[in-house]
């Protein structure tokens, strides 16, 4: 069926479009304008038309996500029972995630922490999220097998083969490195780790582990750069860790997760841990400007109750003292040790207010929103449903000033946010939430409205209240089919799980099988993600090609 979206303000920065025009769709794809009469015309007069939103970093599936629901069941408001069902969905469930992203105009979301040892369970949860295409990033950097290879000096080929085998068996879309060596060091009593500190038992450092993974990702041709969670997250002086890690990449492609939590400069150099922190947003952005090989997502903080989820067991163990309410879970399992710690970002608290300001400052200082991706590191900085409010604050300096006026003076004393007058345009919002994350993930078929793109389209009524505008899309199309009308889901269906098209090296498979049998008494099949685990004839997975 040929469909024309007519009369809307079409915003597609990848094509230089920001004007009233039409978008043509046929067979689930954007097509060139046709001389044929459309079978259907969608009136978008008075509306803004964008590609569907793309989420690059949101914790939406996996063991720690499940644990967070059990630990803090009151975090989300439960939904009403669907028609024909006796029970309501649990708050934060797959249907809640899919519906709330779709209402905001998002059509793709990525879970950034896919533990290879828990890959099947995580993929089953991802497959339970309706309306969205989704994927996961395989976590490496603390597992004993990789660290053994590096300790024994087996060379780049062996590391590459192990990374490729892990991607193939976990069906990951990319690779994430979380405080490389930190979980391993924690098991030997280490409570703080920096880039060049030695990791007990292995004689390695974060720098060496990360460098090996950077090389492997490039050699395999993974479209998404190595997704890095640095040392010392959330501590005064964390900006030093990010900048040092950026320089250690030595020009190789690298993506930094939740940069806001690293944009903390030391206030008192003589008492760095007790003197508090100040914004290092200017320093972080200057460093990024000097290194075009790098990108980051923000990890914006929003006020209110949340729960922090991370495989960075060092940080979660340290953060347990600030848990609110006072309950937490810490796990030191092989490779994927981590923790779940509830946290309250107090609306008038000086620390929370400064964190809030730093995230906005990072985005408003960025000269290239395509390299500055909007995230809240859901749920760590807050719930992703706050994106519309964040967008409002970026687009409206007056609204931002009103909010700042309600916050403690520390926001002006230790950040530059109150002095920034910049307002984001629609094109910059599209870069921040569409073209930037799609390009970063290597998903060339989305994030834009050029010919050949997936017909994932969001149509918003142009409203000066940008929070309202982006909270409830007028119409959302997924593969050309309407899934949301006037902010309500009108059709439920399952999207695809995106996974990298790679094959495991036969020799490394044999080595991995032997290693796992010796260590766990279980082989590769135990950790596999077979098609048979998913409903027949649904085509759950969709391959994403490696870079040439």
Curated annotation (Swiss-Prot):
Lineage: superkingdom: Bacteria
Positions contributing to Zn(2+) 2 binding: 227
InterPro entries (UniProt xref): Amidohydro_3, Formylmethanofuran_DH_asu, Metal-dep_hydrolase_composite, Metal_Hydrolase, Metallo-dep_Hydrolases_sf
Swiss-Prot/TrEMBL keywords: Cytoplasm, Hydrolase, Metal-binding, One-carbon metabolism, Zinc
Subcellular location, principal: cytoplasm
Pfam family, one: Amidohydro_3
Gene3D superfamilies: Urease, subunit C, domain 1
GO biological process, one term: one-carbon metabolic process
Cofactor(s) named in the record: Zn(2+)
Catalytic activity field: N-formylmethanofuran + H2O = methanofuran + formate
Residues annotated as signal peptide: none
GO MF terms held by the record: hydrolase activity, acting on carbon-nitrogen (but not peptide) bonds; metal ion binding
An example Gene Ontology CC term for this record: cytoplasm
Job of this protein: Involved in the transformation of 5-formyl tetrahydromethanopterin (5-formyl-H(4)MPT) to methanofuran (MFR) and formate via the formylmethanofuran (formyl-MFR). May be catalyze the hydrolysis of formylmethanofuran (formyl-MFR) to yield formate and MFR.
Family from the record: Belongs to the metallo-dependent hydrolases superfamily. FwdA/FmdA family.
PANTHER family reported in the protein's UniProt record: COLLAPSIN RESPONSE MEDIATOR PROTEIN, HYDRANTOINASE/DIHYDROPYRIMIDINASE FAMILY MEMBER
Protein name, UniProt field: Formyltransferase/hydrolase complex Fhc subunit A
Organism: Methylorubrum extorquens (strain ATCC 14718 / DSM 1338 / JCM 2805 / NCIMB 9133 / AM1)
Gene that encodes the chain: fhcA
